[in-house]
């Protein structure tokens, strides 16, 4: 659906101004959207997942280990398909305000893909370079979006996620190098035109 057609649909959660702002800047923030009680359940689940990796020494297609991972000090980069691991995760994806927001911005027919945990540890970790998420998807249709939920408070001191407002209106940059190898990042040559000087940090309390 076009943005004009989507905006004609009755909203389930967002105001019309919020919907229009999304199409203008390409993202929205909802501080403290997820309740403290919901977050506590998630934190327990995450702790169990981390503990379960103490005996793992190499990454798999579902669990990506951070460099320096040990049984004594487990460090993960990401865990995929978390919605398959616990019914609470699936409820957040399918029976919460999140699918209502998705419908307000994508149209009434929404398809869920998967839920993933990204870990950002203290004392450094793997660098995440400037990239465009759509380049990671096996889709040619641009009508997709990601929802990110902070399980803990995120401040500027923690090196938070940054986004470039309105960059969705610009070009999709190549994420392969000159040897046609996947890099998962915008090339240094393209960064000068990607608008990174206009980037804004996404910070907020847990549940944002």
Role assignments for model-derived ranges:
Residues 105, 131, 138-156, 203-205:
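Short, conserved beta-strand element in jelly-roll/cupin
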Residues 11, 27-29, 146-150, 163, ...:
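Conserved hydrophobic/aromatic beta-strand scaffold that supports enzyme active sites
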Residues 1-25, 31-130, 136-139, 176:
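Non-heme Fe(II)-dependent double-stranded beta-helix
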Residues 96, 100, 145, 205-208:
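A structural signal for well-ordered alpha-helical segments within the folded catalytic domains
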Residues 108, 122-124, 153-156, 169:
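Short, charged/polar surface micro-motifs in flexible loops or helix N-caps
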Residues 154-208:
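Double-stranded beta-helix
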Residues 116, 121, 132, 149-153, ...:
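Short, structured patches in soluble enzyme cores that scaffold and shape functional sites
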